[in-house]
């Protein structure tokens, strides 16, 4: 049986094809039939239009295939024509292959005679079959039996032939009206959505099923619902699409009256009876319980709507399907709808296609608009509604006009988009709206626990309110626990905030308005937040009492989107901050310390990035609510305050605090500290010892050259970055760090040896150190070690025995490396010994003997003897026996021809393509030699080895072609020699030829 989607995607030349016996109906019934269809605007194929001289049978066959509906007029002489019977076979074939609709009319003949080929109809059939084969007879007989079972109009059941023709024409019109249309052809991603929803619908199951389509506003739920209605309607007795349910709340109706009105609307639509009136709520069940119906309830926003229209499955006949589209997932739980298709955002590629369809009327951007297209797609957040509306507005616009729209989109949402998205916001209660606004303005992409701490109030169940926003698809919680709101919804929130009356406005975000409020001390208790971008303002002087009247101010964020180096805010040293502050974010804070009267007991986050602070405050503050402390870039900061009470602090950022020399001993109390950033603390030399922070997992201390002692803050630590420090040794106590996964000591030149490592370690980076020795015992037992990086360890002479778990060994530019311990236990690893020019022959043999290694590279110019199939140049042909598969090992000699760039050679790719003797593709392999930062790349001749497998080899010759390309297009390498070793099913004959392409 053809799928409905196949018929939906076809172009039909004719609405109707009629199969008939001419002498029975052409000048009587058929002529009236044609006239009625013409009056109804239904195009029929007319066999009288066939040009003379054209073979009639192929022309009719083509006409059948190009018709949406075929009507078979079965008269007493229909079976006397082999031509008619062949038409019937073609019609039924089109029904199966293309989803063509078949209707029947029994004109002066009994359906039973058609099915059984009896009576006068049977006599005519037997006469036709007399000169035909038994196979033809069987095919015709089966076709007549099938078509005789199709319920159709029977002339004997009608007193008036004209009325019967009107009824047939009306039925055809209805079928054409529900015929899958072309409205959704070419809609990006629609086919994938329809395919997935159809699997949920399980259309072959006779149970009644309710399925939901859920997702945020503007994602395309209604569009998908309409496409489904178009696609599947012809599979049901009655169908209807009930739209605008969100607005179905007539004034003056109680709940019972509302439900009656909704049921009347549904029955009027599905039964095609305008003005249906009912007097009780059992009407839908009474009228539809034995009908197979397909109903789509669009934009449902109240469970009462579902109770009125689809309260129970037994309201509908077997095989019925009810689809509900909604943004509210909680509503679906309340009604017990468990089968839900959640409409996700399109991929980057699909989003660009959607935009281009409307902006350029094609699926890709025009020349010169690629970057602009990506910018618009990003600003629309890949929301289909936004892409459609903005794309349509950009149609025919030049690049300058596109750039104007992009600048506008950063702060203002299109009215048509806002009209749709604002509905969700307006459906919220006051507390929920307040939460929505605060997330939109302050806390999008923030950690959920942090947001709860920021917004928690005694009278507000923040967890419950967040769940409401999630269930209404206004936010979602990412897998890492962050609260995320769509960019366009953020703009909806900002504009909703700005529409409030100034004296009622809860959050101030307009820079000029904020300046006016602060300069004139006219803030009010209604203000809970200030988001102040100082980039575009003139100089503003703030009095010490500017914030005092804002007694409920909890969130203060002062920042610059454009950093020009100028401080435009003049603030007094004794400025009063409201005591209820939970968020204080002030980029480039201009004073040496916070005011003496500053109270921090309610602070959840203190962010003073790039400040001029030398210290925060004297003495000890109550900091039990503080979770984040960010002082990054505070060059002048000399000391931290007493943090004894900051027992809930989770993140501490001291990066680029150039003057900070030591950490306070009170840091030992930070038992919830998860991550600490101290990169580029160039003066830091003293850290507390003998402390064990229970929660610390990650420590960043890159670029702390004065730090000589290995920090031992926590035995629970997972990641430790000590890049370019003055650390001289790794202490034995590190073996107690049983959760440590990664240590990066690269660039720590004082490190000479390493003797102790924890067994949990997965990644170790000792690159650019002066390490001379790695103890055998500390590496070989690391059964989880995955990556070992030793680049530019210029004093390292030998490698210890390595664990079998190792997948990547990078020892590039180890100029003194001579020995590699045998066996090299890396059966499936990648071994990079680029520019290890002193690597001995014995070490090279150890590397070569790793037969299953993913790939390996080291300096050399002589092909190993075990590669018995070899050739000069980059191609090689081998004669083989046919086999199910071949495993092979390849070796290529890489010669640098031209190196323009001495540093940052990040990648060299080697491609191997295998064809048979006739040039047909057999298999391929791509090897990428990743070089670390600041690598000089391959400077001399190198041998590169890699493995491959060829499956289903059914030829007697294989041709290997190798190509090499560099990340930097200015560099030029060549493959001067290549070789292959067959590891299984060794061919009897040697290679025949080779050469360069």
UniProtKB/Swiss-Prot annotation:
One of its GO terms (molecular function) is NAD+ nucleosidase activity, cyclic ADP-ribose generating. TIR-NB-LRR receptor-like protein that confers resistance to the pathogen Leptosphaeria maculans (blackleg disease). Pfam families: NB-ARC, TIR, WHD_ROQ1. It comes from Arabidopsis thaliana. Gene3D superfamilies: Helical domain of apoptotic protease-activating factors, P-loop containing nucleotide triphosphate hydrolases, Ribonuclease Inhibitor, Toll/interleukin-1 receptor homology (TIR) domain. Keywords: ATP-binding, Hydrolase, Leucine-rich repeat, NAD, Nucleotide-binding, Plant defense, Repeat. Its EC number is 3.2.2.6. One of its GO terms (biological process) is signal transduction. This is Disease resistance protein RML1A. Residues 12-176 form the TIR domain. PANTHER family: DISEASE RESISTANCE PROTEIN (TIR-NBS-LRR CLASS) FAMILY-RELATED (PTHR11017:SF418), LEUCINE-RICH REPEAT-CONTAINING PROTEIN (PTHR11017). Disruption phenotype: No visible phenotype under normal growth conditions, but mutant plants are susceptible to the pathogen Leptosphaeria maculans. Residues 191-447 form the NB-ARC domain. The gene is RLM1A. The active site is at residue 87. The TIR domain mediates NAD(+) hydrolase (NADase) activity. Self-association of TIR domains is required for NADase activity. LRR repeats lie at residues 194-218, 534-557, 600-623, 624-647, 649-670, 671-693, 694-714, 715-737, 758-781, 783-808. It catalyses: NAD(+) + H2O = ADP-D-ribose + nicotinamide + H(+). It is an enzyme of class 3 (hydrolase).
């Amino acid at each position: 049986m053809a799928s409905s989607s196949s018929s939906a995607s076809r172009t039909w030349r004719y609405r109707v094809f009629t199969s008939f016996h001419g002498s029975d109906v052409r000048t009587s019934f058929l002529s009236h039939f044609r006239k009625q269809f013409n009056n109804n605007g239904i195009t029929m194929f007319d066999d009288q239009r066939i040009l003379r001289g054209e073979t009639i049978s192929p022309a009719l066959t083509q006409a059948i295939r190009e018709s949406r509906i075929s009507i078979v007029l079965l008269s007493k002489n229909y079976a006397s024509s082999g031509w008619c019977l062949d038409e019937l076979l073609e019609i039924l074939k089109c029904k199966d292959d293309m989803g063509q609709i078949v209707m029947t009319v029994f004109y002066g003949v009994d359906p039973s005679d058609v099915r059984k080929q009896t009576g006068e109809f049977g006599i005519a059939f037997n006469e036709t079959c007399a000169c035909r084969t038994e196979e033809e007879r069987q095919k015709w007989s089966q076709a007549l039996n099938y078509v005789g079972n199709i319920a159709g109009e029977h002339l004997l059941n009608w007193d008036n032939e004209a009325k019967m023709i009107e009824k047939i024409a009306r039925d055809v019109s209805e079928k054409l009206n529900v015929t899958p249309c072309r409205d959704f052809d070419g809609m990006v991603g629609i086919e994938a959505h329809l395919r997935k929803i159809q699997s949920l619908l399980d259309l072959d199951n006779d149970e009644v099923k309710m399925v939901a389509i859920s997702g945020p506003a503007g994602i395309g739920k209604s569009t998908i619902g309409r496409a489904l209605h178009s696609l599947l309607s012809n599979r049901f007795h009655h169908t209807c699409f009930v739209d605008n349910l969100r607005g179905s709340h007539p004034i003056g109706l109680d709940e019972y009256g509302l439900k009656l009105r909704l049921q009347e609307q549904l029955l009027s639509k599905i039964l095609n009876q305008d003005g249906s009136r009912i007097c009780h709520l059992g009407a839908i069940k009474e009228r539809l319980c034995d009908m197979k119906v397909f109903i789509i309830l669009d934009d449902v926003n109240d469970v009462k709507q579902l109770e009125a229209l689809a309260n129970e499955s037994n309201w509908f006949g077997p095989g019925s399907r009810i689809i509900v589209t909604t943004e509210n997932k909680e509503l679906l739980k309340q009604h017990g709808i468990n089968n839900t298709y959640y409409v996700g955002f399109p991929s980057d590629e699909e989003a660009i296609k959607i935009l281009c369809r409307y902006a350029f009327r094609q699926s890709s951007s025009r020349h010169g608009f690629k970057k602009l297209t990506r910018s618009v797609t990003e600003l629309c957040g890949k929301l289909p509604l936004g892409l459609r509306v903005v794309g349509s507005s950009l149609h025919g616009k030049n690049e300058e006009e596109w750039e104007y729209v992009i600048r506008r989109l950063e702060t203002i949402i299109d009215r048509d988009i806002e009209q749709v998205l604002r509905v969700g916001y307006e459906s919220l209660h006051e507390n929920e709206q307040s939460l929505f606004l605060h997330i939109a303005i302050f806390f999008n992409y923030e950690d959920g626990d942090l947001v709860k701490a920021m917004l928690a109030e005694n009278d507000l169940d923040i967890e419950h309110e967040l769940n409401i926003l999630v269930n209404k698809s206004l936010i979602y919680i990412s897998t890492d626990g962050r609260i995320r709101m769509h960019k366009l919804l953020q703009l909806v929130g900002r504009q909703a905030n700005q529409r409030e009356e100034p004296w009622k406005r809860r959050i101030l975000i307009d820079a000029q308005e904020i300046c006016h409020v602060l300069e004139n001390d006219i803030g009010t208790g209604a203000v809970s937040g200030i988001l102040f971008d100082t980039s575009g303002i003139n100089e503003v002087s703030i009095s010490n009492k500017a914030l005092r009247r804002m007694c409920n101010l909890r969130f203060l964020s002062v920042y610059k989107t454009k950093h020009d180096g100028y401080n435009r805010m003049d603030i007094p040293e004794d400025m009063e901050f409201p005591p209820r502050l939970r968020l204080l974010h002030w980029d480039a804070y201009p004073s040496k310390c916070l005011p003496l009267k500053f109270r921090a007991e309610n602070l959840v986050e203190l962010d003073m990035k790039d400040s001029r602070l030398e210290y925060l405050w004297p003495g000890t503050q109550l900091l039990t609510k503080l979770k984040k402390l960010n002082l990054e870039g505070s060059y002048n900061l000399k000391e931290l305050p007493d943090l004894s009470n900051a027992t809930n602090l989770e993140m501490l950022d001291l990066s680029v605090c150039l003057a900070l020399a030591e950490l306070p001993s009170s840091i030992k109390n930070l038992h919830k500290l998860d991550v600490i950033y101290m990169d580029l603390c160039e003066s830091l030399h003293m850290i507390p010892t003998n402390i064990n922070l229970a929660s610390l997992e990650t420590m960043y201390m890159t670029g702390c050259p004065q730090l000589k002692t290995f920090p031992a803050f926590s035995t629970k630590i997972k990641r430790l970055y000590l890049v370019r420090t003055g650390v001289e040794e790794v202490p034995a106590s590190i073996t107690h760090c049983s959760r440590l996964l990664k240590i990066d000591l690269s660039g720590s030149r004082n490190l000479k040896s390493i003797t102790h490592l924890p067994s949990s370690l997965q990644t170790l980076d000792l690159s650019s150190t002066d390490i001379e020795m790695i103890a055998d015992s500390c590496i070989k037992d690391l059964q989880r070690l995955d990556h070992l990086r030793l680049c530019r360890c210029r004093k390292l002479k030998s490698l210890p025995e390595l664990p079998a778990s190792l997948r990547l060994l990078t020892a590039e530019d180890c100029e003194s490396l001579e020995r590699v311990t045998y066996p090299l236990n890396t059966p499936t690893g990648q071994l990079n010994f680029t520019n290890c020019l002193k690597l001995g022959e014995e070490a090279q043999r150890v590397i070569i003997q790793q037969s299953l290694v993913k790939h390996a590279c080291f300096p050399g110019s002589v092909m190993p003897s075990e590669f018995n199939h070899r050739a000069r140049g980059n191609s090689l042909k081998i004669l083989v026996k046919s086999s199910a598969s071949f495993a092979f090992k390849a070796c290529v000699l890489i010669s640098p021809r031209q190196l323009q760039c001495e540093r940052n050679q990040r990648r060299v790719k080697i491609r191997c393509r295998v064809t048979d003797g006739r040039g047909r593709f057999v298999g391929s392999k791509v090897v990428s030699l990743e070089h670390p930062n600041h690598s000089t790349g391959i400077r001399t001749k190198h041998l590169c080895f890699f493995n491959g497998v060829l499956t289903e080899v059914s030829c007697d010759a294989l041709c290997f072609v190798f190509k090499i390309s560099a990340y930097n297009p200015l560099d030029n390498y060549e493959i001067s020699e290549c070789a292959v070793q067959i590891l299984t099913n060794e061919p009897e004959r040697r290679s025949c030829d080779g050469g360069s392409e």
